[in-house]
């Protein structure tokens, strides 16, 4: 979990911006989307191999 300590004379908007930036760097949003629904291991392997194939040909 990302923590942001609000500094003296810092606006709430800038602290919120720092928090969102920290969350984006940590990949929290992508992790939430990935774990939103259960994905069978076979489907996960299939997606991984398809992504590798796309990277290879592009």
UniProtKB/Swiss-Prot annotation:
PROSITE patterns: RIBOSOMAL_S21 (PS01181)
Bias type Basic residues, positions: 43-58
UniProt keyword annotations, A-Z: Ribonucleoprotein, Ribosomal protein
Comp. bias intervals (Basic and acidic residues): 32-42
InterPro entries: Ribosomal_bS21, Ribosomal_bS21_CS, Ribosomal_bS21_sf
Family: Belongs to the bacterial ribosomal protein bS21 family.
Protein name: Small ribosomal subunit protein bS21
The organism of origin for this protein: Lachnospira eligens (strain ATCC 27750 / DSM 3376 / VPI C15-48 / C15-B4)
């Amino acid at each position: 979990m990302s923590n942001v300590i609000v500094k003296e004379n810092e606006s709430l908007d800038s602290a919120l911006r720092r928090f969102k930036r920290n969350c984006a760097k940590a990949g929290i949003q992508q992790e939430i989307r990935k774990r939103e629904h259960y994905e069978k291991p076979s489907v996960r392997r299939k997606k991984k191999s398809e992504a590798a194939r796309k990277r290879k040909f592009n």
